[in-house]
Amino acid sequence: MEKAIRNFLSQESAGGILLLVAVALAMLLANSPLSGLYQGFLNTEMQVRFGALDINKPLLLWINDGLMALFFLLIGLEVKRELLEGALSSPSKASLPTFAAIGGMLVPAAIYLFFNFDDPVTKVGWAIPAATDIAFALGIMALLGNRVPVALKVFLLALAIIDDLGVIVIIALFYSTDLSMLSLVIAAIAVTGLVALNRKGVTSLAPYGVLGIILWIAVLKSGVHATLAGVVIAFCIPLRAKDGSSPSEHLEHSLHPWSNFLILPVFAFANAGVPLGNVGFDSILSPVPVGIALGLLLGKPIGVLLFSYAAVKLRLAELPKGIGWHQIAPVAVMCGIGFTMSMFIASLAFEHGGELYGDLARIGILLGSLFAAVIGYFWLSKVLPKAGERI
């Protein structure tokens, strides 16, 4: 198990560096003479027609609705594996990260609403600081190498996965509008087909892919956010075949490099470019960026620690063997790295609220995530044994 986690984390570390490069490049282009070219590229209309089917969207939405559906497919595969065989497969294993994740979503949302509750336009962004960027958080931890106990890595991984599951529920319940019943019926038929394939023990990924594409198109047209199709597909792909092989894990391992080195960097490049020319100091101190930044930087660690501590004291959970609160605390700070997941929710929350709110949200996300990453890294580095010492 340790070897698998180390391989996973080494890949996430490289992906995290690429994410930083993508963000820096996006910010550079958005605030340079090439800004018009950058925005024009993202707004380029792309059309797909097949008979009566017509999908016409700017490139930015193809990235957010299409590429991110593949990312959520990967998240769904990870959630399913951990629920059935991994760190969430029993109540004793799942209890601490579950309580931590719940606190890590509720407190940041409460902090954001404290600053934005009176504004009906901005309060819809309450879920933005509730997210954790699993790839980036694990990537920062991976920079510390073998000094990090495996149990601490598993705790962060399990917490982030439950957090992602919470984000999936939030998107389904709060960011789906103008529902089309015909599209929902087609989506239901596709889901029925996927479930039937699973029940019949079909392990070939091709039929899941065909029905998955139909499901994605139907969900895209239905008003429910299209990325949720990826999660449904993931839950329907069998974890184990009769011969002991795992179609689900095979697909998960195949998707990881695509997610780390293409999907997430492209998403970051498309969404992180904030033009700062019209953003003054007063704007940075406005309720949206302040609520998001404080939600990530303070709300996340407070929520994670408060709910974890309460669960342990009430004997509803226990700390992993060999792990103390002095190690949990900096990991809780790392959970404030919202980054791509927070930007994704921001793109949904302020889709119709105006470009300014979207820009302010991204500034808050970048500030909160950056400080959480730096503080979490140096704090964890300080409390862990030095290289060569026994953990």
Swiss-Prot record:
Disulfide-bonded cysteines: none
Protein's UniProt keywords contain DNA damage: no
Principal localisation: membrane
Transmembrane spans: 14-34, 59-79, 95-115, 124-144, 154-174, 177-197, 213-233, 261-281, 287-307, 328-348, 363-383
Membrane topology, as annotated: Multi-pass membrane protein
Keyword field: Antiport, Cell inner membrane, Cell membrane, Ion transport, Membrane, Sodium, Sodium transport, Transmembrane, Transmembrane helix, Transport
Molecular function as annotated in GO: sodium:proton antiporter activity
Any GO BP: regulation of pH
Pfam families reported for this sequence: Na_H_antiport_1
Location of this chain's protein in the cell: Cell inner membrane
Reaction(s) catalysed by this chain's protein: Na(+)(in) + 2 H(+)(out) = Na(+)(out) + 2 H(+)(in)
InterPro entries: Na/H_antiporter_dom_sf, NhaA
Entry's Gene Ontology cellular component terms: plasma membrane
Family from the record: Belongs to the NhaA Na(+)/H(+) (TC 2.A.33) antiporter family.
Role, per record: Na(+)/H(+) antiporter that extrudes sodium in exchange for external protons.
Name this protein carries in UniProt: Na(+)/H(+) antiporter NhaA
Chain's gene name: nhaA
